[in-house]
Every structure is written in structure tokens, then in C-alpha cells.
């Protein structure tokens, strides 16, 4: 298995090392191994030579089965938006990572801000390359009293359908329920396309129950009845917002993993923890590597290593449930890896 590894900045290097440790432990005895290539991408490289992501970088990344990312950014030295647009979004569009996958699980032992959350275990399938993030907009008469700015949400049948099909496939593997989240009563054109696509594709997945929530109602249900959700499919902007809410409901983004996926398999998909680079604690050995480890499990699952993914997720669940509150980065990774060897 050939993995491109982007440790990135801050705690990214530390948590990625533990993720790889656990992934190798999960593969032990299978006859398979992980071959890694490290890429110096992120704030450090940008500050050193002004480069973000070159054509040579992209060509080299494409030679791998998948990409494991730690975290990038340093708000102390790089202005907001530079790395997001020039590195992360560029990679997403060029490598056609049209699916953003975000599992949301409330693990035993983790405190939710909800008084009685019940069992929380759902995934959000967010469209990643269209919508309001497609970059279709502009401004005129800037810095005048008559300034005009617009951002156009771009939604294509092709783009919507491939994400909807991916969501239905995931629903078939899970509890067989899919919820479309949008705002069809106001966004009648984009919302109409999403609703019609879901209705039509649903005819091929008759064992999956389908329902619909306006985005505002979905945020209410996520804090009053999160167990109602199994697979949520939604557009780029709504998905960006609702996944952060899902992270908060399940104890914070420190445990949240994500996948940026080319569902066709043409390009390598990328997996990363949702948390940032946390430069304030970098090098102290206290960063929680759990989200990075769970990102490794997502990577395995994407590549068909279901048993290994299941084993990592079970090991994480057991470890999180038995923690005493203190975190040492290397100790957590070693403990989870050793539990897979036993």
C-alpha cells in the first residue's frame, strides 16, 4: 500500500506518526505493508519559498493509493485563507475530491453538551466541489457606496448525482436510512435539483428509507434528537456548517475524522483529522491523536480493508472509554497499537 503522507504543521507531525503506528499494527500478520512518501506541504514550506502546491507535487501525489494529512496552517504567520485556497481547496478540485465524508460518533466515556443525547452514530456526506465554494463570483465598484458582490451556487446534475449515489451506497452498508438536508422551499432551483436527484436515485435503492429536512430544522434535530440520523447527504455550504455542529454534539472536533474522496478511484483520496495544527501545543506531546487514528481507519475502509478499519475503530472505542482524562500523544498511539497486536 503506497501512502502519500502530508504531516503538515504544528501537531500534524505528531498525530500522523501515531496514526501510521496504529495502521501498521492493524496490518501486522496480513502480509501487507505500508510504503510512505512524505510531502513538505503547509505553512513551513510557504514561508520558506512561497510555494503551496506545485504541478510536480500533484503528479507525485497521484502515484499513491491514498493521502494521509496531519494538519496545516499557522495563524501566527500565514494569513487566513492562503493555505485553505492555495493548498487544500486546490487539491480538492484538481484531485476531484467530490465527496467529503464525516462520521459523527459519540463514544462511551465522552461527554456531550447534550443532557440526554442517546446513541449518536451517523455520517454526513457533503458535496465537495460545487455549490457556493466553486469560486463563481465577483465584485464591482469595490470600496464605493455602490459596491456589488455576488457568489453563485453551482449545482450540476452530474455533480449532485455522484454524491447522492455515494450516500445511498453508505446507507445500504449501515442502518438503511438517508436524509437529504437542504432548503428547497427557498432555494428552489438548486434545491429542486437535489430533491429530484435523490427521488430518482432512490428507485434503485428500495431498501433505503429516505426523508428530508430543511437545514434549519436539521440543526434543531441534531441537538434534540441526533439518533434520528443515519446518513445525511447535503451540499457544500450546508455540509460545512452541519458537520461542525455534529462535531460539537459528539464531544468536539478533537475526535473527528474526515475523508475527501474521489469516489471513482481515479485520484487518490485524502484522509485527515478535522482539528487544526494547534501550534500552541506543538512539540509538547499532549495532542490527542485519536482523530488522526480514526482517519487512518477511514482510509483503510475506503481501500477495502474493512476488517482492519473495524479493528481500529473498536480499539479506539475501548481506549476512549477507559481514559482518565490525561493525554500523552505517543502513549495513546502505542496503547491502541498494542491492543491490536494482542
Swiss-Prot record:
GO BP field: L-leucine biosynthetic process
Co-factor note (free text): Binds 1 Mg(2+) or Mn(2+) ion per subunit.
Pathway, per record: Amino-acid biosynthesis; L-leucine biosynthesis; L-leucine from 3-methyl-2-oxobutanoate: step 3/4
Entry binding sites for NAD(+): 276-288
Positions bound to Mg(2+): 216, 240, 244
Catalytic activity: (2R,3S)-3-isopropylmalate + NAD(+) = 4-methyl-2-oxopentanoate + CO2 + NADH
Enzyme Commission number, as recorded: 1.1.1.85
Site (Important for catalysis): 133, 183
Recorded GO MF terms: 3-isopropylmalate dehydrogenase activity; magnesium ion binding; NAD binding
Compartments, as annotated in UniProt: Cytoplasm
GO cellular component: cytoplasm
InterPro entries xrefs: ICDH/IPMDH, IsoCit/isopropylmalate_DH_CS, IsoPropMal-DH-like_dom, LeuB_actb
Major localisation: cytoplasm
SMART domains recorded: Iso_dh
Keywords tagged on the record: Amino-acid biosynthesis, Branched-chain amino acid biosynthesis, Cytoplasm, Leucine biosynthesis, Magnesium, Manganese, Metal-binding, NAD, Oxidoreductase
UniProt cofactor(s): Mg(2+); Mn(2+)
Subunit record text: Homodimer.
The name this protein goes by in its record: 3-isopropylmalate dehydrogenase
